[in-house]
C-alpha cells in the first residue's frame, strides 16, 4: 500500500519542493496549509484549499487548510509579548515549530489517515537504538536544526525532511524542474506577525498603555551610576549600542534589562562576555532526561558558532552551561542548543546569564 505523507505547505519554495520530491519517490502527498493570522476558528477543522503548488500535472496534489489562529495567538503571540515585558528576547519561530506546525501537522495526519508528516526544513533524522536522532542539514548556510530543538521523540518519529541533504541552489533548480510556482520567490527573514520587523512599534500597538508604563526608568553603568533615562526597557536588546542617547568617553552597550526595577544596565564591550549561563525548559532529544554533566558543543543564537561547553543538570528541567571560551552578548529568552558533531542533542531557553568579572 502506498504510504501517505502530509506535507506542511507554507507557500514558499522549500515546502513545495519537499512535497514534489516525495511525490517523485512514490508517496501519496497531501498538503496542509496552517493558517495563523486569520479570524480565529472556535472549532478548527480541515477545509479544502485552493493553493496550487505546481503547474506541472505530475506534481499537483490536494491541499487542505487548518485554521490555528486562536492557538497561535495563545501559544506564540502571548509568549512573544510576555518575554519582552519580562526583559527577555523571545524566539517565536522555534515555539511556533513545536506548538503550531508540528501540532497542526500531526493533527492533520490523524484526520487524513496519513502515516507520516514532512516539512521543508533543512535538517535530517535517523533511527538508532530505537530512538530518532536529529541532525543538521548538510548545507551549512541553510541548516535549520537550531530551530527544532523543542521537538520530541513522538514529533520526530513521524517526521521526514526531504531537503536535509540538499543545498539551496539545488532546491531552486528542482523547483524549476517541478514547475513550482514559488520557484523564484524570495525568502522572508521577518517575524510573520510583526509588520516591517519593527517589534518596538508592534509592542506599542499590541500592549495598551505600555509606553506610559515603562518609560522614564534609569539607564545605569556597571557601578549603578545613573547615566540617563530610557524610553522603556522592552525597547532595548542585549548588546545594543546605538539609540541609548548617552554621551560617554567610551562606547556603552546594553548589558542587562531589569524589568523589576525598570532599569537598563550598560557597560563596555568586554562586559558582554560570559562563560556561564542557566537554561530552563531543557529538552534532551535522544534521552528522556539529563542525569549527569556532559560535554557538548553549544550555540546561543542561530548564526553563532558552536563551541565546547559543559552541561550540568539542575532540578526542574534546568541546567547550568559553562562554555570553555566566552560567549558574547548572551540574551535571556534566546535558546542555547547543543550538538555532538552533526547531531542535535537538545536545548533550552536561556533564563540567566552569569557575567564574568
UniProtKB/Swiss-Prot annotation:
InterPro entries the UniProt entry points to: MnmA-like, MnmA-like_C, MnmA-like_central, MnmA-like_central_sf, Rossmann-like_a/b/a_fold
Binding site for ATP: 8-15, 34, 120
Catalytic residue positions: 96, 192
Name of one Pfam family that matches: tRNA_Me_trans_M
Signal peptide extent: none
UniProt entry keywords in alphabetical sequence: ATP-binding, Cytoplasm, Disulfide bond, Nucleotide-binding, RNA-binding, Transferase, tRNA processing, tRNA-binding
E.C. numbers: 2.8.1.13
Localization terms from the record: Cytoplasm
GO cellular component, one term: cytoplasm
Origin superkingdom: Bacteria
Major localization listed first in the record, in broad terms: cytoplasm
UniProt keyword Chaperone, yes or no: no
Top class in the EC scheme: transferase
Gene Ontology MF terms: ATP binding; tRNA binding; tRNA-uridine 2-sulfurtransferase activity
Catalytic activity reported: S-sulfanyl-L-cysteinyl-[protein] + uridine(34) in tRNA + AH2 + ATP = 2-thiouridine(34) in tRNA + L-cysteinyl-[protein] + A + AMP + diphosphate + H(+)
Disulfide partners: 96-192
Keyword Cytoplasm tagged: yes
Interaction with tRNA, as annotated region: 142-144, 301-302
Annotated positions for site Interaction with tRNA: 121, 334
GO terms, biological process: tRNA wobble position uridine thiolation
Function: Catalyzes the 2-thiolation of uridine at the wobble position (U34) of tRNA, leading to the formation of s(2)U34.
UniProt family annotation: Belongs to the MnmA/TRMU family.
Record's protein name: tRNA-specific 2-thiouridylase MnmA
Organism lineage string: Bacteria, Pseudomonadati, Chlorobiota, Chlorobiia, Chlorobiales
Amino acid at each position: 500500500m502506498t504510504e501517505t505523507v502530509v506535507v506542511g505547505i507554507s507557500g514558499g519554495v522549500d515546502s513545495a519542493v519537499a512535497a514534489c520530491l516525495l511525490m517523485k519517490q512514490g508517496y501519496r502527498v497531501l498538503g496542509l496549509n496552517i493558517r495563523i493570522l486569520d479570524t480565529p476558528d472556535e472549532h478548527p477543522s480541515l477545509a479544502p484549499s485552493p493553493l496550487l503548488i505546481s503547474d506541472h500535472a505530475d506534481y499537483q496534489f490536494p491541499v487542505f487548510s487548518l485554521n490555528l489562529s486562536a492557538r497561535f495567538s495563545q501559544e506564540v503571540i502571548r509568549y512573544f509579548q510576555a518575554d519582552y515585558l519580562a526583559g527577555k528576547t523571545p524566539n517565536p519561530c522555534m515555539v511556533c515549530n513545536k506548538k503550531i506546525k508540528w501540532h497542526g501537522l500531526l493533527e492533520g495526519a490523524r484526520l487524513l489517515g496519513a502515516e507520516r508528516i514532512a516539512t521543508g526544513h533543512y535538517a535530517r533524522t535517523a533511527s538508532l537504538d530505537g530512538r530518532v536522532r536529529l541532525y543538521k542539514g548538510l548545507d551549512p548556510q541553510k541548516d535549520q536544526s537550531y530551530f527544532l530543538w523543542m521537538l520530541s521523540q513522538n514529533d520526530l518519529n513521524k517526521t521526514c525532511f526531504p531537503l536535509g541533504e540538499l543545498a539551496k541552489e539545488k532546491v531552486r533548480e528542482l523547483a524549476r524542474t517541478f514547475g513550482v510556482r514559488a520557484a523564484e520567490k524570495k525568502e522572508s527573514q521577518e517575524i510573520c506577525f510583526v509588520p516591517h520587523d519593527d517589534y518596538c512599534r508592534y509592542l506599542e500597538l499590541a500592549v495598551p498603555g505600555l509606553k506610559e508604563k515603562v518609560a522614564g526608568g534609569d539607564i545605569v553603568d556597571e557601578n549603578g551610576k545613573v547615566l540617563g533615562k530610557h524610553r522603556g526597557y522592552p525597547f532595548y536588546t542585549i548588546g545594543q549600542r546605538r539609540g541609548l542617547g548617552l554621551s560617554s568617553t567610551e562606547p556603552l552597550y546594553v548589558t542587562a534589562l531589569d524589568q523589576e526595577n525598570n532599569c537598563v544596565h550598560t557597560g563596555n564591550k568586554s562586559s558582554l562576555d560570559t562563560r556561564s549561563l542557566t537554561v530552563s525548559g531543557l529538552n534532551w532529544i535522544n534521552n528522556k532526561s539529563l542525569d549527569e554533566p556532559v560535554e557538548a558543543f553549544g550555540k546561543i543564537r542561530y548564526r553563532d558558532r558552536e563551541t565546547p561547553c559543559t552541561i550540568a543538570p539542575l532540578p526542574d528541567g534546568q541546567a547550568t552551561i559553562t562554555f570553555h571560551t566566552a560567549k558574547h552578548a548572551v540574551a535571556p529568552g534566546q535558546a542555547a542548543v547543543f550538538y555532538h558533531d552533526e547531531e542535535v542533542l537538545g536545548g533550552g531557553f536561556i533564563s540567566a546569564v552569569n557575567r564574568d568579572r
